């Protein structure tokens, strides 16, 4: 179902709100915010024309136990991927749609793996989104063109071996739409479960996944895994078969500062609204 948007005229709204508050004498207010209705880029009538008819595949991950900032960043990143359309033959780039990741773009500091350390940085947790998209693409029988596993196995991406790390500008996660119609990506969070669903037109292909299998597991937490994606056409002929190997190092090689990543002063590039939201999540 199509939904029309509403764009607020921020300058007019600021002046209107300030004027109404000034004249209210502390009484309750009902303010009609100025703005304009915006048509959806893709309407319901366009869906059949583009081939958005049925479910192709589903990917899920579980982020139970995530710190508040991590959950916040996951939800913020998801805003970039609602109803993304991937054209036939197009290569989807996660980093391209994600855009900038910093305080100015609404992200909070949380732990990331970078420079051989586990340290707080804006956007920690976004890989929950990229890993879920990876799984949806795999189960939809699409061609993965770029993917890298995390430096060490992270509990939020079980089963191990089906994660996809990203960092702007690289590493990126990419897949190619190998169908003859558009693919639409939709996501939802239910409790601690993040789900991506890919919609398009089924062409008779079937996808089978073998694994992931743990090939080797060290006492230091290091691990090697592999899984295989096999895709057959409507006649049962295999036309795509890829193995995805993951080599995880020991977590001890990446110093961890602990769970306390709280800021005590407002970063200079943050708005007051961002700082209030941060303090609300981190009392």
Please provide the spans of the model-predicted regions.
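Well-ordered beta-sheet/strand-loop patches within structured domains
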Residues: 2-283
